[in-house]
Amino acid sequence: MQRLVLVAAVAAMLSACAVTPAVTTISPAPSDLQKPGWQAVVSAEDQDRLAHLPGIWRSALEAVPRRYRRLVTREGDLLVAGAARERPATPPGSYRCRLVRLGAGAGGEPPVQSFPDFFCYVRAEHDNLLSFTKQTGTDLPGGWIYDDTDRRLVLAGAKQRAVGDNSLGYGAEPDRDLVGVIERIGPFRWRLVLPWRGERPGLDIYELTPVPLEQQAAEPPASPDSP
């Protein structure tokens, strides 16, 4: 029997609050039905990078000079490798995302740096998928969120070129690829941990906290090109 399918288009609306940035769609994740999960998407090198994340974390902390230790202590569980808790899923919506950079940069930067809050968005897509976009600032990670263990999710994506241009997916430009983990570290508190690429041990750690309810953007419909 022939069935008629009615498709309703729902317009995406954002809150009028000035602090809430626009929501944009990132490029689709590669689809590989034979090998579901993030392992089917990322390179062997990046799989190895995540496998060695505890060692990278330990090396970055050990390299922090004594005079900077108070900055590590001040961040509490955010910089504690074993602080991940169960049920890591991030509810869709707007988040404040604050970057703490852990590691000695090539340009002589301090080994612990904390940056101001910016805005990120976790978006609900088709087939129970989630996407992540950093919407403001200069460093603009974005990608797809994959289930992993009971204490972490995996983000696979790329460093986007500009605010609002989220066209790069993982693998499009390997030099811009990124992988990381999302963990819950407390009530209404998550972190996104991105290990550095290259020889220097270091981490970009984003503290994610939900934007207050009255400042949340109305959730747009799922992107039709989701995998």
Name what the model sees in each region.
Residues I26-S43, V122, N128-L140, A217-P227:
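Primarily secretory-pathway and cell-envelope proteins
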Residues R87-V154:
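Mid-length scaffold segments of soluble, non-membrane domains
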Residues Q2-A8:
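Sec-dependent signal peptide recognition
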Residues L14-A16:
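C-terminal motif of bacterial Sec signal peptides marking the signal peptidase cleavage site
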Residues A18-T90, S226-P227:
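Amphipathic/hydrophobic helical signal segments and adjacent flexible N-terminal regions
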Residues K134-P141, A158-V163, L194-P201:
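Short, solvent-exposed aromatic-acidic interface loops
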Residues G105-P116, L155-V181:
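An anionic, turn-rich surface loop/hairpin at beta-sheet edges
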Residues T73-D77, Y170-P227:
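Edge beta-strand at a domain terminus
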